[in-house]
Amino acid sequence: MAKLWFKFQRCFRYFRRKPVRFFTLLAIYLTAGSLVFLHSGFVGQPAVPQSQASPAAGSPVEGAELPFLGDLHLGRGFRDTVEASSIARRYGPTFKGKDTSERAKLGDYGGAWSRALKGRVVREKEKEKEEEKAKYIGCYLDDTQSRALRGVSFFDYKKMTVFRCQDNCAERGYLYAGLEFGAECYCGHKIQAANVSESDCDMECKGERGSVCGGINRLSVYRLQLAQESARRYGSAVFRGCFRRPNNLSLALPVSAAMPNMSVDKCVDLCTEKEFPLAALAGTACHCGFPTTRFPLHDREDEQLCAQKCSAEEFESCGTPSYFIVYQTQVQDNRCMDRRFLPAKSKKLIALASFPGAGNTWARHLIELATGFYTGSYYFDGSLYNKGFKGERDHWRSGRTICIKTHESGQKEIEAFDAAILLIRNPYKALMAEFNRKYGGHIGFAAHAHWKGKEWPEFVRNYAPWWATHTLDWLKFGKTVLVVHFEDLKQDLFTQLGRMVSLLGVAVREDRLLCVESQKDGNFKRSGLRKLEYDPYTAEMRRTIAAYIRMVDTALRSRNLTGVPDAYGPR
């Protein structure tokens, strides 16, 4: 140690006497390091031929009766490991990544320019598909005293786009969307103003260069093509159906008012003002209230029985004294909104198990409303925590949550739970939902480039076998398993959610379940305006998935359970 210190002192004194040599050597050292760093930047990852790829992709075995399922037991990092593990890596300079003929196809500008050009073309095609969902009508006069579109409105002086306005109006069930001042969006069921010259609509959208968003007191108006569920709305109110008058009207619907000039919006506005979630139109009378056991809204009647025209709006139906037209207002039913952690640590761990894309997040929302307790998760998703799932941050074994979300399969993971609700969904729908989540978020959409590119076929090849093994594993290794089909939950939420609450050991309260029915969508439903315009499944994909469906159906029936719904397709 003393010798080393002595040598260091000699070097220090030497360079102190000759500083020029010191800085020269330092500059040479830094230059050499920079060259090594720059050289490492030329390392690429060329595509590996199919013959060299990992065989763990789970491709069907030729000549076999059923497709090969493989050992697809994924851990907590399942979202990232599937793709990473299936590709072998090779490193080398980029000029060896492609042969001469392949590089020639890229032109003089190389791959980066081609990718940028391709991305622009894809974005233009996506925009064209979005525009097909709405037809431009024209430029219309607008006045603050007498609006052309008299529904809801919202403003965004930084990020307003045509599609954003259309999407918001479509979600609320309006037929028309109009943009003004480059940043204002108005919705309505009819245009109540005159058409003017197109040159008057000359203001660019604040969030989209090159797009027109009206002008000064001028609206750029679009006619929307609504999804089926959106078409059953009236502005911000949701159409619930035609129902027979309840036996004890004053108890079922406690607030009533006579309206000689009845219209849907007048009754909805009255009940909204009185803070009731239901508006029932009965000819010239408007009734307001909550869904209760006296008026549960479960037995719908033929809409022709409610087809009496409104006195103030000839194109609207206002029901009769015996048959009510019912709308749900935007007033929140607070009877099922309180949530908390379990007061004492639970002795049982109950899983809410599903394949990704099968509606687990939605089911958690329903369970929290129905029980009043937070649900937990085997994972952690910050975006879900920010949306109100406060149990997301708890460890899954904490015992403070009513059940635990999990996508796990495999004996060890399953046997860690004392019981499970197994949520099963049509694989065709589940795969598409998970693909949208993966590339677009919980309520977003994957871009058309992802559907048309290599991502979708690879996704189906990896995830379709897992849809089957996930269900089979839970049926085999689960201690107590309640099977709930996503489609049944949507169609008969009251009954199916009651079954789920019973398994969780919580008393079933009918009024609370009725409250959940009116809040069932939450903030976890994708927009109705933007839909995929074609079937992404090839004939080969459908044959493979059909075999998995038959396998799961057989397993369910062998345990005296209901088989998969008929909507899954031929078996």
Curated annotation (Swiss-Prot):
Residues 44-571 are extracellular. GO terms for cellular component: Golgi membrane. Residues 1-20 are cytoplasmic. The keyword Membrane applies. Keywords: Glycoprotein, Golgi apparatus, Membrane, Repeat, Signal-anchor, Transmembrane, Transmembrane helix. Glycans are attached at N195, N248. The keyword Glycoprotein applies. The chain crosses the membrane at residues 21-43. It holds the Pfam family WSC. It is found in: Golgi apparatus membrane. PROSITE patterns: WSC. One of its GO terms (molecular function) is sulfotransferase activity. SUPFAM superfamilies: P-loop containing nucleoside triphosphate hydrolases (SSF52540). It is a single-pass type II membrane protein. Residues 133-225, 236-330 form the WSC domain. Belongs to the WSCD family. Sialate:O-sulfotransferase that catalyzes 8-O-sulfation at the Sia-glycan level using 3'-phosphoadenosine 5'-phosphosulfate (PAPS) as a donor, forming 8-O-sulfated Sia (Sia8S)-glycans. Displays selectivity toward glycoproteins such as TF/transferrin. This is Sialate:O-sulfotransferase 2. The lineage of its organism: Eukaryota, Metazoa, Chordata, Craniata, Vertebrata.
